[in-house]
């Protein structure tokens, strides 16, 4: 028989990809804040909400240009070493603007040591996983999904912006017989109640995954594929 797929964040994006590649095996997709826009745009929107919005306008304007160039570079279909090489000066400029890792730029360090430290930091920041996210455009896979889709976001999600993400799903998933989208007020990317939704709050929140979301998910599965209602 067919299998239903559920995924959170990039897991939701991967669920769409599997559903597109193996339509004969997938009964439905549950996307919990699964990204439906190109990775480069996703990262830039995260940057706007999580980093740039917290900074003075003069700083954020300069950084915005650097981040746009960085993500544009990382989106190019290049070997990872080439991507890291091209990205290093951009990341150094970003870190200098943010005052991060200032030890890398101390005057008493030689240029060769500074360059080596910058390469090390860039190598850590630009992993194969991050590069693959930025280079991936889910639109092709979404347009090939043939199963029912239930896609939800929290209204305070700053990592996968709810309105634009759900609009993309509704627009692209034309092959699906049923697309249900919903935005839950007060919930963050983790589907917990949150003051602002900023990731810096994650470790401080004491609530659990929303019971309302779980109940709605179970009800949708029951109505869509006739499965027994699950009690959470």
Regions found by a protein language model. Give the residues of each.
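Catalytic active-site module of serine/aspartate enzymes centered on a nucleophile-bearing elbow/loop
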Residues: 187-190, 196-232
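Short beta-strand/loop motif that positions the catalytic acidic residue
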Residues: 145, 151-153
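Short glycine-enriched nucleophile-adjacent loop
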Residues: 12-23
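Alpha/beta-hydrolase fold nucleophile elbow
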Residues: 1-9
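Catalytic histidine neighborhood in serine/cysteine hydrolases
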Residues: 173-196
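Short alpha-helix in the alpha/beta-hydrolase fold that links the catalytic acid
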Residues: 147, 161-172
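Acidic catalytic loop of the alpha/beta-hydrolase fold
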Residues: 156-160, 189
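Accessory cap/linker subdomain of secreted extracellular hydrolases
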Residues: 32-143
């Amino acid at each position: 028989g067919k299998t239903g797929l559920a995924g959170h964040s990039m897991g939701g994006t991967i669920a769409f990809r599997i559903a597109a590649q193996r339509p004969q095996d997938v009964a439905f997709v549950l996307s919990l804040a699964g990204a439906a826009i190109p990775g480069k745009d996703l990262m830039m929107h995260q940057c706007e909400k999580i980093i740039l919005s917290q900074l003075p306008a003069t700083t954020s304007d300069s950084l915005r240009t650097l981040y746009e160039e960085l993500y544009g570079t990382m989106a190019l279909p290049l070997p990872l070493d080439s991507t890291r090489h091209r990205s290093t000066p951009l990341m150094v400029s970003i870190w200098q603007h943010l005052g991060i890792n200032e030890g890398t730029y101390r005057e008493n360090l030689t240029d060769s040591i500074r360059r080596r430290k910058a390469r090390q930091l860039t190598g850590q920041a630009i992993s194969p996983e991050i590069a693959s996210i930025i280079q991936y455009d889910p639109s092709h896979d979404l347009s090939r999904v043939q199963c029912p889709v239930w896609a939800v976001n929290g209204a305070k999600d700053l990592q996968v912006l709810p309105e634009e993400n759900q609009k993309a799903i509704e627009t692209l998933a034309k092959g699906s017989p049923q697309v249900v989208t919903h935005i839950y007020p007060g919930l963050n990317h983790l589907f917990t109640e949150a003051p602002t939704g900023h990731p810096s709050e994650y470790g401080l929140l004491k609530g659990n995954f929303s019971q309302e979301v779980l109940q709605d998910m179970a009800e949708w599965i029951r109505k869509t594929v006739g499965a027994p209602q699950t009690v959470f």
